[in-house]
């Protein structure tokens, strides 16, 4: 027997082991007809899943965000069924069909058919037919050999591969059936196909089986799904807006960065204008960190093999590292992280308790292997710069340090115009290193730091890394998307591996606390987010060109040059458009280049020593003296105002 506490009823029940949510709902005499699934001990289940353990059960309805997982998983199966009905069961071979943040996809092989976006409406119509038929969705289990035989008969080679390599011997093999369609799956799924909500298929792309280039290329069909048509419409409108804000297009149009296949995928080159943005961000970062007591360091891009063995990267992270280099009979690796170097800086001399806290900070370039299909502009790259820092401190300093770091992170992100955050606290997993007391101190300090900000936060219970708990901060952009930025992470692993210690007041050795933290996460990615958040119209202090001077005619060039020199003397980034073009075209081109200020100069301005100021987001122009304009723009730059 098992005991289940049903949160919706605030009551505990005793059931036979193996009972399903469907059975439980029947026992409640139809009181909860709108339930689409449940959450048992934090794990999403459907109405068909056998319950074999005691715990807390929460019913999931459409208004619960977690219920979308059930909807989207079911729609992946409905799409797979539609493909088989359109192109023939024997011609369609299914790979995997998981959910995504906003929908689902399925990887398939279709003999004799290469899908394009033009095929999607036909697939959608077939899916709607399946939904309308209201097939009951049923779960059943097969013994391992029977399951393999079943899929061999259907020529489902990828399902057989999953059974043989992903499902351990002795573990139940579950399948789901709707109509004549059967798929290997753990769930969760809806009670029937007619419970499905609003959806849209959005794209087709290639995807290697298991993500390996040596495996067959499958076709991946993406869809998005929500419970209501309004939610779907709002999301599709957001996607259209996101296309206009694509940082890859903005970067090309504004000549900010370059990713050249001759150099290598995922390796960004900063062009002069993009380099200005990056330098401004890095300079502000360094200034703020020095003000807060950090010590700036620089470390090499490569390290000896032994370093990565000691750190554990070669045991746990090697698949994300680039291959070993042989130099003078010794192995070297380009660094995927800066941490071991900072540890060695700490260990370069004996440390006393009086020195703490030690805060080491670096804008360190790291290299991590990403599959070519995962690369995406500046958002997913192979070489990037982390705004990395490691704080090494005593136990009595932990709480203050965490509070200070979180304060730094939030204030920094706010200074770039972000004011909506989602904060997550990830706690101790089942398997972990370090002692329980250190975990307790760390988790309490993280929790108190978040609560001191007044922000709501979500707890990912057991979601911490094996080496320490952490805080993650996500920012919401102008069109409502969330982006992972700041991480504050305890590490109980590296201090042990590298035998880090300090001499305490008792003249004995003690193990320090070590905190990893990054504010942006990646400079490249953060700039990509900024470009999309502002649609290229960056705050004036970040704009590569802050002012464009537009002379009305050639006779005004001499005065325009005088204005330019005055601005340059005041460290204002300015360009003079001396092309033989009409003024309206020059203005339009400056707008397309997202330049925040235009100064139009003609006879009147030359005679009076003024400029006609056209400011982004404002109608018409304002006449100011050169000094007045310089004073105005310098104040905007200094205060980091957003126009």
From Swiss-Prot:
HAMAP family for this protein: Thr_tRNA_synth
A family per Pfam: tRNA_SAD
Primary location: cytoplasm
Keywords of this entry: Aminoacyl-tRNA synthetase, ATP-binding, Cytoplasm, Ligase, Metal-binding, Nucleotide-binding, Protein biosynthesis, RNA-binding, tRNA-binding, Zinc
Annotated ranges, domain TGS: 1-61
Keyword Metal-binding: yes
Catalyzed reactions: tRNA(Thr) + L-threonine + ATP = L-threonyl-tRNA(Thr) + AMP + diphosphate + H(+)
Alphabetized Gene3D superfamilies for the sequence: 3.30.54.20, Anticodon-binding domain, Bira Bifunctional Protein, Domain 2, Threonyl-trna Synthetase, Chain A, domain 2
Enzyme class: ligase
Similarity annotation: Belongs to the class-II aminoacyl-tRNA synthetase family.
An example molecular function term from Gene Ontology annotations: ATP binding
Gene Ontology biological process terms from the UniProt entry: threonyl-tRNA aminoacylation
GO cellular component: cytoplasm
Subcellular location(s) of the protein: Cytoplasm
Cofactor(s) needed for function: Zn(2+)
Region (Catalytic): 246-539
Cofactor descriptive note: Binds 1 zinc ion per subunit.
EC numbers, comma separated: 6.1.1.3
UniProt protein name: Threonine--tRNA ligase
Quaternary structure (record): Homodimer.
Function noted in UniProt: Catalyzes the attachment of threonine to tRNA(Thr) in a two-step reaction: L-threonine is first activated by ATP to form Thr-AMP and then transferred to the acceptor end of tRNA(Thr). Also edits incorrectly charged L-seryl-tRNA(Thr).
Residues annotated to bind Zn(2+): 339, 390, 516
Cross-referenced SUPFAM superfamilies: Class II aaRS ABD-related (SSF52954), Class II aaRS and biotin synthetases (SSF55681), ThrRS/AlaRS common domain (SSF55186)
